[in-house]
């Protein structure tokens, strides 16, 4: 079995590179067809109300993501102030979106900041694990519903057909059902993974995870939908976002640069919206959801680092009570 590991790692690298090359080719093909003058015209003429609404949804999305770590606070029972938890979550999420691949840098950022604030490594691991689980539970639930009901219309030349996507949707919903069943009825609620003790949450806690994460994914989809001028069905846009997110995980490109654009251009090709509108919406989305929060996160990170010793002492006194 051990001998197969190097081959499997090599196969994964080859498949990842093939997928990456396919995305690049797809992006180049569509980029050559785009009327870039139309793109800049759309950006210049953006409706102010739509932009302000999109900004509001960005704030809502980041607050919802911060709730993942508040759930972690409840789950672990640590006593860090809620505002500190939200600030750490914001900084790590903004860094992760733009600078990392598949959460690697986010985990390092969380360990750095939470440990500076006085939390032990075992607690930080549980917080990070719960955050990742919460994020993907919302994805799995929404993806299961959207893929099962065939809301996403795949082009004829796509890598999988709609039947396969429906089967995937059913599998995702089964995963949700199994998770809820274990949370509600499992007698053995403690498990150890890589030396870390994990406890199954209650079914009510699991429902809270799904509700918060689903709301976050829906807010992200609504941002793009608003920036596209609401010309495409909202749930179709959300479904395309879900497809592009999993494609970004496969390719391992920081911020999913190029992947998001390639998937949206491919899947929205048959809709009544121009490629210029799609590109303009995604550029605006990247500025609002990635770039501006990253700048704010850098400032917040410096503030946290400068005040870490004072905050740690205060937190240790609170945890000692």
Predicted regions, residues:
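Predominantly cytoplasmic-facing regulatory/coupling regions of multi-pass membrane proteins
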Residues: 1-90, 148-249, 275, 280-282, ...
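Membrane-interface alpha-helices at helix entry/exit sites of multi-pass transporters
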Residues: 83-87, 102-106, 116-133, 273-284
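Transmembrane alpha-helix interface/packing and boundary motifs in multi-pass membrane proteins
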Residues: 91-100, 242-261
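Membrane-embedded alpha-helical segments of transport systems
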Residues: 95, 99, 124-144, 247, ...
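Re-entrant/interfacial helical elements at transmembrane boundaries that shape
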Residues: 104-116, 145, 254-269, 283
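Interfacial segments of multi-pass membrane proteins
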Residues: 113-123, 240, 244, 262-278
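Hydrophobic alpha-helical segments and helix pairs
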Residues: 116, 120-157, 163
